[in-house]
Amino acid sequence: MQMGMAVLVLVIACGVLSVLFAIWAIRSVLAADQGTQRMQEIAEAIREGASAYLTRQYSTIAIVGIVVFLLAWYLLSLNAAMGFLIGAVLSGVTGFIGMHVSVRANVRTAQAASLSLAGGLELAFKSGAITGLLVAGLALLGVSVYYFVLTVWLGYAPADRTVIDSLVSLGFGASLISIFARLGGGIFTKGADVGGDLVGKVEAGIPEDDPRNPATIADNVGDNVGDCAGMAADLFETYAVTVVATMVLGAIFFHGSDALTNVMLYPLMICGACVITSIAGTFFVKLGVNGSIMGALYKGLIATGLLSIVGLGVANTLTVGWGEIGTVAGKSITGTNLFVCGLIGLIVTGLIVVITEYYTGTNKRPVNSIAQASVTGHGTNVIQGLAVSLESTALPAIVIVGGIISTYQLAGLFGTAIAVTAMLGIAGMIVALDAFGPVTDNAGGIAEMAGLDPEVRKATDALDAVGNTTKAVTKGYAIGSAGLGALVLFAAYSNDLAYFAANGQIYPYFADMGPVSFDLSNPYVVAGLIFGGLIPYLFGGMAMTAVGRAGGAVVQEVRRQFREKPGIMTGKERPDYARAVDLLTKAAIREMIIPSLLPVLAPIVVYFGVLLISGSKAAAFAALGASLLGVIINGLFVAISMTSGGGAWDNAKKSFEDGFTDADGVKHMKGSEAHKASVTGDTVGDPYKDTAGPAVNPAIKITNIVALLLLAVLAHMA
């Protein structure tokens, strides 16, 4: 136990180091030059809009959170309610601090880029690293410190139901914040983007980020609340939920074993080691002699991955060792096999990054095919974009299947869980790549609105083009890890259910239930699969509709300002930027509530609906379990299709910024008919990649977390 205590303290120290590094980086970023007075005025407007939106969003979520906290206290225990509170608060804090830095780094990045491309890259990436390492550090601290409190201070055994229920509740707290932040931020950012583009670029013929567009500030605000705060909450949730699910599986599989304590600490130690490797990886991000921005970022990612192999070895040595740990479902589990599972997790991460970059990167076949289709019109652009979005699901799915089968063969479901934990271990570096995107996007907008030298805009555009790809790549990673993480949660659900059923004398609700079969010949299983499968589509449809409504409101507002203030187009009158920001804030908050509650309530409706119809608890649990699989499988494909397809549409549009040469050798410039067709495609792709697709991620996980909590609540019933 003493060794276990030392390992747990070491894990906590790793989390603290991550937060301290983020604090150091914050001071470094805020010390940089803010540029001209005009640049600072624009940045201040973006800051005010982002803070106003996030404050209102969190105030709304807090109302829901208080209700859930009280329910968790009443239905489970105070410890479970406190777990929920810890997960929710830390998730919110991560997003808020990340956005707080992002909206201050944008103007500093624009100023640094005016001096050198390398300076702009360094500042933007350092800003992203703050968010990334806060995500990893606070998620790790949340789980490890609360586990320490429960097992050391309060004296519960590691596999005690109080510990498991409290950790699952922590994951639920993170999930609830995540789905609201992802969806609300996505509706805001894409409502501004779509509305502003349709009137500004297509109707008025003015360029992106032109200060004459009343939606420009709202668009830049949206980049931060969607891609920075939203992604931070998403990956915080995936990180926390995956670690918790792996610990739950360890508690179930190794219950009563001498190895139990070390098995429970193993995923925490993996994450602790990988936090350190992520910090080290940030120092490798330097612009090389070839001037490749993506190459500089990949150096950091590759260094993190290679160092993490050593980190996995350290985690093994300090916890489970290298020999046999125990036998699970007739399969011998060894430390060496678990180490290999961790390696497979890192390989899956690398492959998903490469595949996503191929489908979304400029000068690659998929993006070029959409740009070429734009030459023949708006319709062909949309058709080709949809084709690419559908095609982009195949290779990631094959990689994920390979990861599942290989890890299962090596170490069963616990091996798969360790692979996903290793994937999430390097989340600090991945989120850094993502949060780099909104900073560079904003920097370009500030350079344009402040009227800086065209060479500065050229530098920020180069950073922004890479930022677009990194945002797409990190979404691919987030979806892949979410899909595998949800599979681990499903494994926790099915094994938890089996545990309760086998101990009916302790948990009376399950005493007379009988065996639960997930056999496909069971009609309730098929019904559950179909019901679960519809949730990502319905959820995605609701999200797209919300963006359409918000975008439509922005279109009307921008048209009104152009109509009532004709001096805007000549530069004699100033647009009312705050009006568009306020309009979108209200729309996003209003539109996010119902879609966000869909995946939360769906598992409860499935269970009690089937129980009411069939009168059989076994049938209801089978239908619920099947619905979780339906959500995972369809959610995975819907999310990949939307994010990769949307990213390809976006970069196809950017192909025309410097001129696109078609198959016949004709060059199409910005403002051409082909460019206008690409803008139409991008207005479809934007809500695909930044609202509906990413929001499916937390929807997948929250359905599984709610199902786990439902089991816990029923087990507490006398």
From Swiss-Prot:
EC supergroup of this enzyme: translocase
Binding site for Mg(2+) 2: 220, 223, 441
Feature type site, description Important for ion transport: 182, 227, 234, 690, 701
Pfam families for the chain: H_PPase
DNA-binding among keywords: no
Record site feature (Determinant of potassium independence), residues: 471
GO molecular function, one term: inorganic diphosphate phosphatase activity
Protein task: Proton pump that utilizes the energy of pyrophosphate hydrolysis as the driving force for proton movement across the membrane. Generates a proton motive force.
Cross-referenced NCBIfam families: PRK00733.1-2 (NF001951), PRK00733.3-5 (NF001960), V_PPase (TIGR01104)
The protein, known as: K(+)-insensitive pyrophosphate-energized proton pump
Protein source organism: Brucella melitensis biotype 1 (strain ATCC 23456 / CCUG 17765 / NCTC 10094 / 16M)
